[in-house]
Amino acid sequence: MPSTDLLKLKDFEPYLEILEAYSTKAKNYVNGYCTKYEPWQLIAGSVLCTLLVVWVYELIFQPESLWSRFKNKLFRLIRKMPFIGRKIQQQLTKAKKDLVKNMPFLKLDKDYVKTLPAQGLSTAEVLERLKEYSSMDVFWQEGKASGAVYSGEPKLTELLVQAYGEFTWSNPLHPDIFPGLRKLEAEIVRMTCSLFNGGPDSCGCVTSGGTESILMACKAYRDLALEKGIKTPEIVAPESAHAAFDKAAHYFGMKIVRVAQKKNMEVDVRAMKRAISRNTAMLVCSAPQFPHGVIDPIPEVAKLAVKYKIPFHVDACLGGFLIVFMEKAGYPLEKPFDFRVKGVTSISADTHKYGYAPKGSSVVMYSNEKYRKYQFFVDADWQGGIYASPSIAGSRPGGIIAACWAALMHFGENGYVEATKQIIKTARFLKSELENIKNIFILGDPQLSVIALGSNDFDIYRLSNMMSAKGWNFNYLQFPRSIHFCITLVHTRKRVAIQFLKDIRESVTQIMKNPKAKTTGMGAIYGMAQATIDRKMVAEISSVFLDSLYSTDPVTQGNQMNGSPKPR
């Protein structure tokens, strides 16, 4: 009795005969058509067709989308048109001048030092000069600056200065010369991994800041993806994820795929799932994200990471040293965010923010050394010997590492819990009061220290301008148009929060007398930037800001940056 498989095969025999007949007919047609061409023509045609296919493929499949490249090309052509180009250039020049006018930090009444002094200055003279420079700063001690300075407590400052002085000349590039410094750095990493519930295999590195921590994680996953055969590794990140991920994509030849947010400003997990492709090198969430202070749904995204076997980075640069103490401070978070979540493979956390270490220190952590090894750079063939570096920099300031260690040891768990309690208490108070102020609203549901404000009744940038006139400093946000304020230990001091709310209420009341009035100053510049379709023009204008940071040209005296200048 014939088997079932043979019976099934016989059922397809008529179809196979038809297929064979058509293939023979097609073959004969092609052979007949090609008889009028010489062999060299067929070879040349094949080569040209192959080159054309490769060219079309490379044209379409690039890190920058075809639509984006088309728009950029179109805008470049428009700017070259005689009349339109001149008009655009005039507006561009005006925007640059307006930007410079609104850079108060350029308006100093002191001459710039442009050459070395012929005779070196004494210690007293150098310190006196430095006091002159520090007197130009905003008087942030009043608590009117958003973020920027996270403690500033005099006794802590004294400790950090002494710790830095102890290791001023040390460099972790030479662990054989500075073994004590190596021990300090290793202990910083281990303490931080423990705070984020890393297991015995967890590891990390100390970096110069949040951006470098993010860059290092992206570099590690880029190299891992390349090893797997992915030619253009992709970073799948929320729209709200830090711009350092764009920087990493730019530096490392990656492509960033931005994923939409929901109305509550959390990343849309379904949209993130749709964004995953065979080129995805890493997934990203924030805890919290910088613009609105909202924590992304980390456990849900972690499930995607596990399902598709993709590394998953949690960016906790801003609030890392708050979220780990929230539960003990009496403000437990609804969802886990650290290495307890299966699928989380790396975390970045800034010690120089709510860790209260001096600027220039952060930690990037990995769940396992198998990820960290891709972060390292090793050149085994250099004439100067085998060169190995854990992060971007070669030489690094040992003083910063020592001061970071000193801050961690000085605060201890109890100190951080108490600081977190004060900050979150102040933030929750401000949040509850701001929710009751008419004509403004809070974006999302911030659980930590950042509160973003918007308005449906007036240009929210006007509120920032008006608060600036009262000495306050806000951060401008875009898409959607909004502003935010970041609460630190400085803002927990007596009456700072009360004064903040008083000035907000007064400013909103004043604005609502003429809600449609034109926005001026930096608010107008940000408004213009958000409305500009050609983003290359916005980048060109922004470069003026960067150029100005290195300007040594004298500018007429004016006010300092948003905030109260120090008394002279």
UniProtKB/Swiss-Prot annotation:
A Gene Ontology BP annotation from the UniProt entry: fibroblast migration
Lumenal side: 1-41
InterPro entries: GrpII_AminoAcid_Decarb, PyrdxlP-dep_de-COase, PyrdxlP-dep_Trfase, PyrdxlP-dep_Trfase_major, PyrdxlP-dep_Trfase_small
Cell location: Endoplasmic reticulum membrane
Cofactor annotation: pyridoxal 5'-phosphate
Membrane topology note: Single-pass type III membrane protein
N6-(pyridoxal phosphate)lysine: modified positions: K353
Modified residue annotations for 3'-nitrotyrosine: Y356, Y366
Matches recorded under PANTHER family: PTHR42735, SPHINGOSINE-1-PHOSPHATE LYASE 1
Task performed by this protein: Cleaves phosphorylated sphingoid bases (PSBs), such as sphingosine-1-phosphate, into fatty aldehydes and phosphoethanolamine. Elevates stress-induced ceramide production and apoptosis. Required for global lipid homeostasis in liver and cholesterol homeostasis in fibroblasts. Involved in the regulation of pro-inflammatory response and neutrophil trafficking. Modulates neuronal autophagy via phosphoethanolamine production which regulates accumulation of aggregate-prone proteins such as APP. Seems to play a role in establishing neuronal contact sites and axonal maintenance.
Assembly behavior: Homodimer.
Protein name from the UniProt record: Sphingosine-1-phosphate lyase 1
Natural source organism: Rattus norvegicus (Rat)
Lineage of source species: Eukaryota, Metazoa, Chordata, Craniata, Vertebrata
